[in-house]
Amino acid sequence: FDNYTVGTLQGQYVVDSLDLDNAGDKTYNIEFTAGDPADNNAGYFFNGAFDVLKPYIDAGTLNVVSGQTDFDSVATPAWDTQTALERMQNILASYYADGTQLDVALCSNDSTALGVTQAIESDYAGDNTVLITGQDGDEANLANIVDGKQSMTVYKAVANEAVVTLDLAKAMLAGDTIDESLIEKSGWDFECAYDTESYETSDGNKCPSFLLVPTVVTKDNLQEALVDPGYYTMDDDGYLHPAN
């Protein structure tokens, strides 16, 4: 999957939800929670979101009250929920205890979003609904989306990833040229792009990649995005569970 795009989808969701392009003199407060610094994917997620939001930060439309905007400051070792919870509790106590309004908690994934949500529920002095992003479509987070506690998650259909991997392996065994032509030959019914620039090996060599496009999931499209394709089932009460 295109992990940079995961971040841009999160960032663009914030832009669209707050209508930042038409904010005028209105300003919003945002805090970032990124992933494990030992996981190279975490940097792609964070950079994708930050690149979208940086123009609004530079313009003063978005304010990072804590001042924590670099990856190392906002990273969460092991993507740990408790670590994310405690860090957000510290931020809330240090910068928002006086009633300053927090509008957005940009979380790179669902495990960190879960901790951030818990911290906001227990320690946030404001009474507004905080926009919270995530990624993965974890069951607990989907329940929070149903309950209005989390705004969105970015879902990556691993079944589609498996299809691409299988077709790629077949093409390699057949001695076919591996390039963008594989996409047309395979006739996949999902969006995929061939990329030769974005990703590198550990020694700095470019790594050609087939990048699938993830899906933004909100309360409004849970059925269409997750249930109808068979990834999840939905109970009568609206809560989702992974399909067997």
Ranges and model annotations:
Residues 1-244:
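A residue-level marker of the well-folded mature domains of exported/periplasmic proteins
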